[in-house]
Amino acid sequence: MLRLGLCAAALLCVCRPGAVRADCWLIEGDKGYVWLAICSQNQPPYETIPQHINSTVHDLRLNENKLKAVLYSSLNRFGNLTDLNLTKNEISYIEDGAFLGQSSLQVLQLGYNKLSNLTEGMLRGMSRLQFLFVQHNLIEVVTPTAFSECPSLISIDLSSNRLSRLDGATFASLASLMVCELAGNPFNCECDLFGFLAWLVVFNNVTKNYDRLQCESPREFAGYPLLVPRPYHSLNAITVLQAKCRNGSLPARPVSHPTPYSTDAQREPDENSGFNPDEILSVEPPASSTTDASAGPAIKLHHVTFTSATLVVIIPHPYSKMYILVQYNNSYFSDVMTLKNKKEIVTLDKLRAHTEYTFCVTSLRNSRRFNHTCLTFTTRDPVPGDLAPSTSTTTHYIMTILGCLFGMVIVLGAVYYCLRKRRMQEEKQKSVNVKKTILEMRYGADVDAGSIVHAAQKLGEPPVLPVSRMASIPSMIGEKLPTAKGLEAGLDTPKVATKGNYIEVRTGAGGDGLARPEDDLPDLENGQGSAAEISTIAKEVDKVNQIINNCIDALKLDSASFLGGGSSSGDPELAFECQSLPAAAAASSATGPGALERPSFLSPPYKESSHHPLQRQLSADAAVTRKTCSVSSSGSIKSAKVFSLDVPDHPAATGLAKGDSKYIEKGSPLNSPLDRLPLVPAGSGGGSGGGGGIHHLEVKPAYHCSEHRHSFPALYYEEGADSLSQRVSFLKPLTRSKRDSTYSQLSPRHYYSGYSSSPEYSSESTHKIWERFRPYKKHHREEVYMAAGHALRKKVQFAKDEDLHDILDYWKGVSAQQKL
């Protein structure tokens, strides 16, 4: 119960009308300024102007409250007011000087109140007031000097009041006045009103609502309009009063009178003020008039069409004031041009057909506009004979732009055509050079250039020059090794290594060669000449690799037979082909542990001739891994014996073919009598290393564990897993397709760059900008083939001695990797 009582008491306190504190909606700006304070329709309504509003407010709206009076004490603190809305209150009294503190006030709305008069004191201090709205009040008297303190008034709304008479001097001091609304007042059309009517005739009222000004008294003039658009109409008050009050003399009516217009910003009045905002902005000059040229400016219509007009403006003194030609369009106006000469011919174009236009000559002085004379005309309707306005300028611009674009397209097309033609010529020349070089590599350097070019032009014909292969040497199977005397005799005869390049080796000078297949040359017809070249070289290298492997295994087998005596029993069905080893093999002699280790067959000693040495892996011609270089795991340490085989160079005794001497380099085991191949016997079974056991001699890969110019993967053979039959099967030639012959080291699908087998030739692909954006080639794979072919061709073509064998050694490793 106690809680319910407390809640009820609190609710009564909140809902009590007397305790409610009125508030206003404020729109604030920077630095604490209040731009707008809306205190209208407050509940409860204000009876006095509230004092809690910030004094910096610019726009104060107190309409629809219950204000009774306007006092100086309640307004003096609002010094920044520019707009004050007191519409629909109960104001009946305004203190004299109540607006003295509002020197910046421009709009004052006092409509729908209970004011009975307007005096000079009530409007004192508002020198910047432009709009005064006192409509729908009870005003009966407006003193003649009521607006003397407001010289900037533009619009006055006194409609719907109780005015019966006005003095002629009431609005005479308002030079900027443009709108004076007096409709809805009960005018008494007597002679005391004639002075005001005389001013009203001269005044150029923008609204032109003359029909709304009517007389209510005396009775005989009730309903007569004060003024009408035709002033000499018989039924109007001014005509009657002119005959009655001036003895028949009509007051002089000037044809034109300067009507000032202020450029100050017009403010939209409140919607409840009883004043239509469109009527304020309705600026329509009077009808056209003619004046004396010596008295003031004059404007005449010279020529008019349905889209243009020509005006003649005459100004007697053009430099006395600043004259401007202004166009009025209902409620809007715009400046056309400044008039600086006494007589100017103004041509107006881009007009609409059958449209009324109004142009006025206006002078500007002290930021105020004065209309001197105006001209209104209507453009005529277009006829079939009239021509539309010319659009030559626009057409000229459009055609110029299109011409420039078309010219740019032509120039770019010509440049593109020239560059493409030049590029095609370069490609053609490069293709011819490649074919020429390939023919040189096939037929040798001693062939004359004319024959090569002639052969290159015949793309589909087979070669007519004989091409010899490398001489084949009979197999070593079944033959015995030469005696020790033969070996010693061979040591006494040194061999001089013959020098030759790859072309000479391929042609096989002095040897029995096989004819080259005739279907090799037509491979040049396709677009991948370099790929065919690499494939051809790879095939030849495979054959060389097979020969080298056969020779190495034959040497190991014969050495094992020599050391094992008659107890060494090999498989008689095994056949080895060695086309590069002599027919009579040399015998070996046992040497000490200090024997000089030399490289294996076709493995030259490494020279630091390259600035960028590559890490050499284990050689493919080594028969065992690094672990088998010492002692086999199948034998014991005690029975392990180290043998060395001396291979002397004795070409006369062995009967080497003349053509095979090109394969022997001066660094090979056949050249030096002191070269020894260390052989490691591996025990078998229980490790009894007697003479009756089978000894497998293995070449120690001492040299191949060092660095070399070329890096290639090695062959690994596990001694325990690989049998002799497996090794023999490895020596069988492998058949691979032409596509697989291009090794991964040179495959353009993995490396889009050139290839060079040594650092002497750069491996970077020098693509030009045009090559990257060639529209007629979607892929640069052919360029990669060309780069690889050129690099390898140069290296092989100009290689001598050790360099040649280095290349063969490299390709041997590559071939071995592919076989794995």
From Swiss-Prot:
Keyword Cell membrane: no
Bilayer topology term: Single-pass membrane protein
Keywords from the UniProt entry: Glycoprotein, Leucine-rich repeat, Membrane, Phosphoprotein, Protein phosphatase inhibitor, Repeat, Signal, Transmembrane, Transmembrane helix
Positions in the Extracellular compartment: 23-397
Signal peptide: 1-22
GO MF, one example: protein phosphatase inhibitor activity
Subunit structure: Interacts with PPP1CA.
Task performed by this protein: Inhibits phosphatase activity of protein phosphatase 1 (PP1) complexes.
Protein name: Protein phosphatase 1 regulatory subunit 29
Protein's organism: Homo sapiens
Gene: ELFN2
